[in-house]
């Protein structure tokens, strides 16, 4: 396990029209990578592409709804062909689902699982044989602190991110003795538009948020480094505390919600 130098690499990144994806794409381009951008919002994606092309002129973009899993898999191969190959796949696209459990529908859960978990799986399985054939590749999965901690009013979102964390961990074991590497990014509260999506309840969390550039720097470090899991910012102590005494964690979070603190 050794990482890949970003300069000169080709990186395909989903959810690239805003937030963590856009910040990561811009930074990767500035560091010398050719980037392939995937997103739903063509206008925003084109603006990010313009920024990337000023540093990496061969960068490309594809507009795609990753809720369509067949389209996601096809797109991964189309992007591979257009870029020549893909050294690094960054599965970053995600949607929120902010609902107290009594308001959650099966449709909410299916939508969160499809975009946040099944689409990264579809794209990974599409490119993995080609990465194997080339003998090089890194899959970077952007999960969430909510992929290690249960969060109030975010059961569907947490389920999708726990799934992505578990998948990444098991995949890293399966690929451990191969040249294909896996990285898992666990962002904490980051200042992106995921907090204010139309149709979502207001998130319970109302504390400080880090800029997406904090995660972008971490993504670059993860690609070039050799560690599997990266908490950005480093809130792993909360996860360790939960693991040490989960009953206290559950009671403590519930008490904070009930008192509004």
Model region roles, listed by residue range:
Residues 17-18:
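Conserved glycine-rich cofactor-binding loop
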Residues 100-101, 105-110:
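Substrate-binding pocket helix/loop in short-chain dehydrogenase/reductase
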Residues 172-234:
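SDR active-site lid
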């Amino acid at each position: 396990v050794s990482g890949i130098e970003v300069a000169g690499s080709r990186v395909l990144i989903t959810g690239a029209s805003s937030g963590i994806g856009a910040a990561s794409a811009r930074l990767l381009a500035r560091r010398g990578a050719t980037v392939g951008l995937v997103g739903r919002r063509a206008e925003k994606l084109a603006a990010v592409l313009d920024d990337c092309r000023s540093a990496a002129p061969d960068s490309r973009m594809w507009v795609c709804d990753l809720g369509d899993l067949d389209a996601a898999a096809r797109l991964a191969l189309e992007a591979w062909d257009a870029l020549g190959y893909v050294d690094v796949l960054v599965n970053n696209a995600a949607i929120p689902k902010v609902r107290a459990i009594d308001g959650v529908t099966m449709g909410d859960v299916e939508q969160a699982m499809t975009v946040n978990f099944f689409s990264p799986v579809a794209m990974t399985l599409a490119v993995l044989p080609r990465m194997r054939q080339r003998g090089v590749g890194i899959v970077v999965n952007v999960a969430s602190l909510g992929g290690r901690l249960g969060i109030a009013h975010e059961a569907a979102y947490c389920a999708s991110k726990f799934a992505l964390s578990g998948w990444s961990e098991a995949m890293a074991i399966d690929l451990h003795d191969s040249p294909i590497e896996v990285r898992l990014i666990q962002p904490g509260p980051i200042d992106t538009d995921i907090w204010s999506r139309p149709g979502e309840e207001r998130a319970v969390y109302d504390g400080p948020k880090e800029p997406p550039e904090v995660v972008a720097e971490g993504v670059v470090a993860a690609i070039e480094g050799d560690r599997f899991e990266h908490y950005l910012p480093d809130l792993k102590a909360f996860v360790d505390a939960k693991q040490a005494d989960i009953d206290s964690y559950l009671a403590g979070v519930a008490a904070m919600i009930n008192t509004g603190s």
